[in-house]
């Protein structure tokens, strides 16, 4: 009995009494879900396992509802003791005797008998594949399943929570232990594996059994050809490339960057980052200190999944520590830097080789426009991405941008991002609620969402560009406009499910490397979406012209005019005319039919596809002729072919006499207790021939589809321009929505460095809490009032106030209205914030060291257009040293010729003397409060007013915070007594010091011994008084 016959015999013994099949008492052979409780229990290597149905063709695997091992009879696995069947299933009586008789090969699964060490052809193939790709976890297609072997299987079974089946016990079989899953779950499981930082290689069967049989390219017993068709990491995975789309082409995860860092020396680094999903490329060269704050800022922005570090010998410890600190789960790849000649020649050779020299000119472009250090990064990334077939991302130079551009935008440092919680809520990292991006993000599309993140992270510093966005918001908040509304509708139709930017990049990769990187329905949806946008703009051509004349915003007008101009072309319509829309849109069609019926053959001549359709039509006619012949032979003029269990062209006859009278060349395919189904010899031959031509048709359709992708990719620049305009429009709509969310006001921008705000509100706190309860505050920082020293009780609102100032500045320079009654603002080129207390164990820094390093970076980074916010400088060390450092740092900023605007929060009231020394620059403020004295309390209770008041206070009222925190009354009372005692001692010491100072100066005055030193002491005494 053949392998296939044995498989059919065992499968047929399952028969469901609840079957809905038309034939009475017909056994149901099907994959049974877990919930039905149908299981097959077996023991393998002293381990009991329960498995479910599936179907494979080679290797140790599960077939139907049984387990099959290579070299064993199917009957040896199935016996009456190893079947556990649900009550709604019964065993076919016809084969019950097969289950009871002794197996053909008597093998017990619990045996300790050693197998032969001779490897099967499949095992040899698996070993060769794994030996050739030791750096990857391999997922190998075998029949209708994907399997992982050896150590890969141990890892996979644990991550995927699937059964791990051990190999034999001959000492060499552990490498063939495996776990498996159905082929349709490939991309579901790939995503789960990739989240653990693995590098996955997908090995696919590249041959069809029917094509091999018909063309006789090899013996039928030969193995299927298997090769790696895709390699993936978390940053290079592009989504469900091989799976027919369900209408949601977008992944919910944010795309990752892959970064190459080139350590030029200890203080200078170059960097190139690429985001394969979107094609975004960022490059930068920057100076950095040993603390690597600049590198940390870039890593926080880019969120890398893989980081390549180039160096002459070994990467510096400082760089490696910083990478691990910011991205603990990143894949770190140290590399030795290549020589300049190798890099130059490598870039030239790469661009020459892509797409038959189409991008040859880019070799010179990269060598001329980028430094040697940046070129090294490009070359290393090209080599790295080549394995993933993504290196052609560098053939689109328009996607390359600078990380920093001091003339266009500011880059918020990592401390500022952290302190203001721009992108991440550090109280609840799982949610963005409470962040600035959460407040501003009302985008409709995924590509708009990505652009808004860039806008928020890099506020503009060109007044004219900020005004352009503010004018656009003003126009969008005006009267209803048909053109604007039509474009809004187009964005809403795309939503977050259709990512045009990602689909364009998938098309680019697939067109260059002939890969299944994108499915047909997504291509149609993408083109249809572009067409819908352009048709909409074409309909409102007159309205767009009128809009451009009546509205103020050049930014909004340019978007509409450019889209209107593009709508006059036939680029998209010509491509869409080649698609058979009815088949693409009908989701009920078979996936195979979606491939073969994708093109509209009436509008384009695909000769190879036409010829295969012609052959299939001929075969269908031959089937009909054979049916007429069978009718005559069987004397059944109404006889029709039937399809059963996906087996077509079957002749069904009743068991008994009708079966006995069939010609000898009729082959039984399947049956029940009452009927049997056959194919005639001629029908069987035609069926094989039809399968062959269907396979050839699929191949030809895939070739034609790849040519079609190349046509689309030729228009990449055209489509990319549409996406960029739509993304800017989406961001403007988002900022408009944020501006209208509360009583926001358009800021007035001026050339002077000042912040004058009437009744300003912290936008985050206001959004999270009841707006009616919020206490607004004025802000007045200008040339004559550049430094604000802010004191006040703990929890009085000092930090919220200074954060409010920074957030209002950032919002205004993003181009958004801000929450206040009126605002006049200068344009800042940097915002530095030192706030909070934390150590950094990974970098080996204490809390105070971190504080001082951050202060050092601020002092060295300020300009005359900087906003500096310092919170409680000096608290990480002793009081005297803390006060001294806080005083010196603040005085340095005051006296600096750059003279930035400074907000300085402190609990050191003695710093108020700086207002006396610099009355035209420094002003003391405190957060308002009220004291309530009660008879039963040793100390007053505090009511916070949360308003900014001029003046200084000498008490932080920490005991009130302790009370709010729930410390025992006895502890707080004890602390109050100690506090009062310390205050008394300090006052006594101060009086004694004053008496001594005053007495000595009085003696000098009596003796008339006044000199410059005495005068200085006298000034100090008066200041002290």
From Swiss-Prot:
**What does the entry list as the binding residues for ATP?**
792-799
* Annotated segments matching region Disordered: 1-28
* Gene3D superfamilies found in the cross-reference section: 1.10.1420.10, DNA repair protein MutS, domain I, MutS, connector domain, P-loop containing nucleotide triphosphate hydrolases
For biological process, the GO terms are:
mismatch repair; mitotic recombination
Q: Where in the cell is it found?
A: Nucleus
InterPro entries (alphabetical): DNA_mismatch_repair_MutS-lik_N (IPR007695), DNA_mismatch_repair_MutS/MSH (IPR017261), DNA_mismatch_repair_MutS_C (IPR000432), DNA_mismatch_repair_MutS_core (IPR007696), DNA_mismatch_repair_MutS_N (IPR016151), DNA_mismatch_repair_MutS_sf (IPR036187), DNA_mmatch_repair_MutS_con_dom (IPR007860), MutS (IPR045076)
Comp. bias intervals (Polar residues) = 1-24
Region (Mispair-binding domain), start-end ranges: 114-235
Keyword line: ATP-binding, DNA damage, DNA repair, DNA-binding, Nucleotide-binding, Nucleus
**Stored Pfam families:** MutS_I, MutS_II, MutS_III, MutS_V
The record's listing under PROSITE patterns reads: DNA_MISMATCH_REPAIR_2
- Please, which domain of life does this record's source organism belong to? Eukaryota
Q: How is this protein annotated for GO cellular component? A: nucleus
Gene Ontology molecular function: ATP binding; ATP-dependent DNA damage sensor activity; mismatched DNA binding
In terms of one coarse class, where is the protein primarily found?
Answer: nucleus
How is this protein organized at the quaternary level?
A: Heterodimer consisting of MSH2-MSH3 (MutS beta). Forms a ternary complex with MutL alpha (MLH1-PMS1).
**What is stated as this protein's family in its record?**
Belongs to the DNA mismatch repair MutS family. MSH3 subfamily.
Q: Summarize the protein's role.
A: Component of the post-replicative DNA mismatch repair system (MMR). Heterodimerizes with MSH2 to form MutS beta, which binds to DNA mismatches thereby initiating DNA repair. MSH3 provides substrate-binding and substrate specificity to the complex. When bound, the MutS beta heterodimer bends the DNA helix and shields approximately 20 base pairs. Acts mainly to repair insertion-deletion loops (IDLs) from 2 to 13 nucleotides in size, but can also repair base-base and single insertion-deletion mismatches that occur during replication.
| Name of protein | DNA mismatch repair protein MSH3
């Amino acid at each position: 009995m053949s392998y296939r016959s044995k498989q059919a015999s065992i499968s047929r013994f399952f028969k469901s009494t609840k079957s809905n099949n038309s034939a009475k008492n017909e056994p149901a052979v099907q994959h049974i879900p877990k919930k039905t409780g149908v299981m097959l229990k077996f023991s393998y290597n002293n381990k009991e396992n329960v498995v479910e149905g599936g179907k494979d063709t080679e290797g140790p695997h599960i077939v139907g509802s049984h387990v099959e091992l290579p070299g064993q009879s199917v009957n040896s696995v199935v016996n009456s003791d190893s079947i556990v069947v649900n009550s709604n299933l019964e065993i076919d009586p016809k084969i019950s005797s097969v289950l009871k008789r002794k197996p053909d090969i008597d093998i017990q699964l619990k045996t300790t008998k050693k197998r032969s060490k001779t490897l099967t052809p499949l095992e040899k193939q698996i070993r060769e594949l794994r030996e050739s790709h030791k750096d990857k976890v391999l997922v190998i297609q075998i029949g209708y399943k994907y399997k992982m072997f050896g150590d890969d299987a141990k890892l996979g079974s644990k991550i995927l929570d699937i059964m791990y089946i051990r190999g034999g016990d001959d000492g060499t079989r552990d490498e063939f232990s495996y776990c498996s899953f159905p082929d349709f779950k490939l991309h579901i499981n790939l995503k789960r594996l990739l989240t653990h930082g693995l590098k996955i290689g997908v090995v696919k069967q590249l041959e069809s059994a029917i094509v091999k049989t018909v063309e006789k390219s090899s013996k039928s017993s030969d193995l299927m050809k298997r090769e790696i068709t895709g390699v993936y990491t978390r940053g290079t995975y592009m989504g469900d490339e091989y799976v027919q789309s369900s209408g949601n082409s977008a992944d919910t995860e944010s795309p990752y960057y892959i970064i190459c860092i080139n350590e030029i020396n200890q203080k200078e680094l170059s960097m190139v980052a690429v985001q394969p999903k979107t094609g975004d490329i960022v490059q930068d060269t920057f100076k950095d200190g040993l603390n690597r704050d600049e590198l940390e800022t870039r890593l926080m922005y880019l969120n890398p999944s893989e980081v390549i570090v180039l160096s002459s010998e070994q990467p510096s410890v400082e760089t490696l520590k910083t990478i691990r600190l910011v991205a603990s789960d990143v894949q770190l790849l140290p590399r030795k830097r290549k020589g300049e000649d190798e890099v130059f020649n490598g870039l030239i050779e790469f661009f020459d080789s892509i797409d038959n020299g189409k991008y040859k000119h880019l070799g010179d472009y990269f060598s001329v426009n980028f430094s040697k250090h940046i070129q090294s990064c490009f070359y290393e990334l090209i080599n790295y991405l080549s394995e993933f077939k993504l290196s052609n991302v560098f053939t689109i130079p328009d996607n390359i941008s600078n990380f920093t551009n001091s003339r266009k935008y500011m880059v918020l440092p990592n401390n500022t991002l952290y302190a203001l919680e721009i992108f991440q809520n550090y109280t609840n990292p799982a949610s963005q609620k409470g962040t600035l991006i959460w407040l501003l993000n009302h985008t409709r599309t995924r590509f708009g969402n990505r652009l808004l993140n860039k806008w928020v992270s890099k506020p503009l510093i060109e007044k004219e560009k900020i005004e352009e966005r503010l004018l656009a918001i003003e126009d969008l908040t005006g009267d209803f406009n048909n053109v604007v509304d039509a474009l809004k509708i187009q964005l809403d139709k795309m939503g977050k499910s259709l990512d045009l930017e990602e689909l364009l990049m998938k098309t680019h990769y697939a067109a260059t490397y002939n890969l299944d990187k994108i499915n047909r329905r997504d291509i149609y949806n993408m083109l249809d979406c572009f067409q819908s946008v352009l048709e909409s703009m074409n309909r409102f051509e007159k309205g767009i012209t009128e809009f451009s004349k009546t509205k103020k915003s050049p930014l909004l007008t340019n978007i509409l005019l450019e889209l209107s101009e593009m709508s006059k072309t036939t680029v998209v319509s010509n491509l869409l005319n080649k698609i058979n829309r009815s088949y693409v849109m009908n989701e009920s069609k078979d996936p195979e039919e979606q491939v073969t019926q994708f093109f509209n053959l009436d509008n384009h001549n695909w000769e190879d596809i036409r010829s295969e359709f012609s052959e299939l039509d001929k075969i269908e006619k031959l089937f009909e002729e054979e049916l007429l012949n069978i009718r005559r032979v069987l004397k059944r003029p109404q006889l029709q072919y039937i399809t059963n269990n996906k087996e077509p062209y079957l002749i069904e006859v009743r068991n008994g006499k009708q079966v006995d009278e069939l010609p000898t060349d009729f082959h039984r395919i399947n049956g029940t207790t009452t009927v049997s189904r056959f194919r005639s010899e001629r029908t069987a031959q035609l069926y094989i021939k039809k399968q062959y031509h269907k396979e050839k048709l699929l191949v030809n359709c895939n070739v034609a589809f790849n040519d079609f992708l190349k046509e689309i990719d030729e228009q990449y620049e055209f489509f990319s321009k549409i996406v960029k305009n739509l993304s800017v429009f989406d961001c403007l709509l988002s900022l408009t929505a944020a501006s209208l969310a509360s009583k926001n006001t358009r800021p007035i921008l001026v050339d002077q460095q000042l912040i004058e705000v009437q009744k300003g509100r912290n936008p985050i706190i206001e959004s999270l809490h009841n707006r009616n309860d919020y206490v607004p505050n004025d802000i007045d920082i200008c040339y004559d009032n550049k430094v604000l020293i802010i004191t006040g009780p703990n929890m009085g609102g000092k930090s919220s106030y200074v954060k409010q100032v920074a957030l209002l500045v950032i919002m205004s320079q993003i181009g958004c209205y801000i929450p206040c009654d009126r605002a006049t603002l200068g344009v800042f080129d940097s915002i530095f914030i030192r706030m909070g207390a934390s150590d950094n164990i990974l970098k080996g820094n204490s809390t105070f060291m971190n504080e001082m390093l951050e202060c050092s970076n601020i002092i060295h980074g300020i300009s005359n257009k900087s906003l500096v916010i310092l919170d409680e400088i000096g608290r990480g060390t002793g009081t005297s040293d803390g006060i001294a450092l806080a005083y010196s740092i603040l005085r340095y900023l005051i006296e600096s010729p750059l003279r930035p605007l400074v907000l300085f929060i402190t609990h050191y009231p003695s710093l108020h003397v700086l207002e006396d020394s610099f009355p035209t620059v420094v002003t003391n403020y405190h957060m308002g409060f009220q004291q309530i004295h009660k008879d039963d309390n040793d100390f007053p209770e505090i009511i916070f007013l949360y308003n900014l008041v001029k003046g200084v206070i000498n008490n932080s009222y920490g005991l009130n915070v302790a009370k709010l925190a729930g410390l025992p009354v006895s502890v707080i009372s004890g602390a109050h007594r100690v506090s009062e005692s310390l205050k008394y001692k300090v006052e006594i010491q101060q009086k004694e010091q004053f008496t001594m100072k005053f007495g000595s100066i009085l003696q000098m005055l009596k003796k008339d011994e006044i000199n410059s030193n005495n005068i200085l002491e006298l000034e100090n005494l008066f200041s002290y008084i």
